[in-house]
């Protein structure tokens, strides 16, 4: 999604949000990520300006004080950025890939089923279309944010094809866009 994303070329405009819109976004975030509720006022303080950065391909990035927090495409679900996920790793369920998959994930490839079922990988129960943080064997922080394309039980049974779609990974265009003022 952000493989060829460039801040100078991809950003079209930036809009400061009204309080009523911010409340709606906060309720959508608590509905989507139940574990985030106690931390939401710390992530998005009431007095700080909340802006939406609009980008090409109908991408919207939610920022607070210039810090990129969440993004979404069209009016779809919000995804946390990796920078936010590294601060609050508990907001998403985790899946773990083995060491052999790391270089492919960091180049933007989707996570294949064998990378989730081999020794060193850990596959936790998750339904289809669940937003997950993809961790790596022996690493502390998430490599990417992805969406389950198969249920965990199906990944173990079938063990072929794409298991998790890679949405945002370390060193992609969004990762390099550190802040937006």
Curated annotation (Swiss-Prot):
Main location: cytoplasm
GO molecular function list: RNA binding
Alphabetical list of CDD domains matching this protein: MCT1_N, PUA_MCTS-1-like
Cellular location(s): Cytoplasm
Family: Belongs to the MCTS1 family.
UniProt cross-references to Pfam families, sorted A to Z: Pre-PUA, PUA
NCBIfam families: unchar_dom_2
Residue ranges of domain PUA in the record: 92-171
Keyword vocabulary terms for this entry: Cytoplasm, Transcription, Transcription regulation
Protein name: Malignant T-cell-amplified sequence 2
Remarks, miscellaneous: Imprinted gene expressed from the paternal allele in blastocysts.
Cross-referenced InterPro entries: MCT-1/Tma20, Pre-PUA, PUA, PUA-like_sf, Uncharacterised_CHP00451
GO cellular component, one term: cytoplasm
């Amino acid at each position: 999604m952000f493989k060829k994303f460039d801040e100078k070329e991809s950003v079209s405009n930036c809009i400061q949000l009204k309080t009523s819109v911010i409340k709606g976004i906060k309720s959508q975030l608590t509905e989507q990520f139940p574990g985030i509720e106690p931390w939401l006022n710390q992530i998005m303080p009431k007095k700080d300006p909340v802006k939406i950065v609009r980008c090409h391909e109908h991408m919207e990035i939610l920022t607070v004080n210039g810090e990129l927090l969440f993004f979404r495409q069209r009016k779809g679900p919000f995804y946390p950025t990796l920078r936010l996920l590294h601060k609050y790793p508990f907001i998403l369920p985790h899946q773990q890939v083995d060491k052999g998959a790391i270089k492919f994930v960091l180049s933007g490839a989707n996570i294949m089923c064998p990378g989730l079922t081999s020794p060193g990988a850990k596959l936790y129960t998750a339904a289809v279309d669940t937003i997950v943080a993809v961790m790596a064997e022996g690493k502390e922080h998430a490599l990417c944010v992805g969406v389950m394309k198969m249920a965990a039980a199906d990944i173990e049974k079938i063990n072929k094809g794409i298991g998790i779609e890679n949405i945002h990974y370390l060193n992609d265009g969004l990762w390099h866009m550190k802040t937006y003022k």
